[in-house]
């Protein structure tokens, strides 16, 4: 005989991870100082959680937990990483994107990565590996660590965007490069004054944690980052709307 069954199209999945967002900073959670109508609509149409627990509330550990399902404190390397830190996810390990990939989803990470790249001695002037592709992502458009750390460049599919071969990028978290200004030594170059050690390499008048040299054509503009990531995410949705997709959309601080 013939057995009939209903088939359900797999839903598209978008995980939006906000950076340094407090529980009471959304108007749907009682804020009177900030108005967040877009997020409030998501809460109205979906589920608003009023009690929850986080295994970690800091950069790298929270991202490690989300992508692996493991407690981040079980991995001693899951701490707030430097911008030149090696990848702390094992290539080929079971991750949220790799599981969805096997289920037929096209997967993407867009935004702040901060899980390390490469094996510890990164050449930023070629494809950096291992990275998102080696742990389940088909597409990546990321900043390596945080907005306040070097390198202040974006990578698409693990290659620095807009980098000139005539001006190679170098990154160090040990020593400054000869002749390069810093927030500590050149405060007259700053439009925003540092705190808590953010007094090293300068990009866009803002001093960062860590040192870098070269790569001038690839440096991001801080004020454009939110729009850039949003536009990339929207384009990814349009290009993949005919098939199920997963986007890990990780906003920077």
Q: What are the roles of these predicted feature ranges?
A:
Residues 2-253:
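Formylglycine-dependent sulfatase
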